[in-house]
Design a protein with these regions (language model features):
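Long, continuous compositionally biased terminal/linker segments
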Residues: 42-74
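Short, highly charged C-terminal tails/helix-capping segments
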Residues: 142-170
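Long, well-ordered alpha-helical scaffolding segments within enzyme catalytic domains
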Residues: 122-142
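Hydrophobic residues embedded in beta-strands of well-ordered beta-sheets
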Residues: 37-39, 61-63, 104-106
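Short, internal acidic amphipathic alpha-helical interface segments
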Residues: 67-105, 109
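Long, hydrophobic, amphipathic alpha-helical segments used as structural scaffolds
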Residues: 31, 96, 138-149
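Charge-rich, low-complexity N-terminal segments
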Residues: 1-51
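Well-ordered alpha/beta subsegment
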Residues: 94, 99-128, 146
Length: 170
């Protein structure tokens, strides 16, 4: 369908630009490299500022929608948080929650093929799904990000950590 990577990037970039402009959404467009363009947006939803990005990956002919959870994880709690993220990801047919241990950032990423261009209805539907996932996952993960576990969760974490420590110390 596309004669070159440059044509692919140009067409997909224009299609996303048209969609955002049609919805009167403010965005930043960054050309990260000759094969990657990223659109960044922010929305105020339910009292949270939700950041989103749409990333065009020419090499994979994909659009990656990324929703940034409005919470950061304290690295001290990464062990129980990552276990919960693994459980949540196992339930998902598409997309995944990701945790960046360098800065505590948590995202929900959804990649899909745009090899034949962007279908506006599909893009809109997926964009809203990612926004909803961010809000839903925020509610599920937030108490694990700062150690606000209930008694049962606390005991489970302590038990698992104790078993790990005992095994390592052998």
């Amino acid at each position: 369908m596309f004669q070159s990577d440059r044509e692919f990037l140009s067409v997909i970039t224009q299609q996303i630009t048209n969609f955002f402009d049609k919805n009167y959404w403010t965005y930043d467009k960054k050309e990260i490299s000759p094969t990657t363009t990223i659109f960044e947006l922010s929305f105020m939803i339910e009292g949270h500022t939700i950041k989103m990005s749409a990333q065009i990956d020419v090499k994979r002919r994909a659009c990656i929608l990324v929703g940034y959870l409005p919470i950061c994880a304290d690295p001290v709690y990464s062990y129980p948080l990552c276990q919960l993220i693994a459980k949540e990801n196992a339930k998902k047919l598409f997309g995944a929650i990701k945790y960046d241990e360098r800065d505590g950032e948590i995202t929900y990423d959804y990649a899909y093929s745009v090899a034949n261009g962007i279908d506006e209805e599909e893009f809109e539907k997926l964009f809203h799904i990612v926004l909803k996932m961010v809000l839903d996952e925020c509610e599920i993960l937030k108490h694990y990000c700062n150690g606000r576990l209930n008694k049962q969760e606390t005991n489970e974490v302590i038990d698992k950590i104790q078993k790990l420590v005992n095994d390592i110390m052998r």
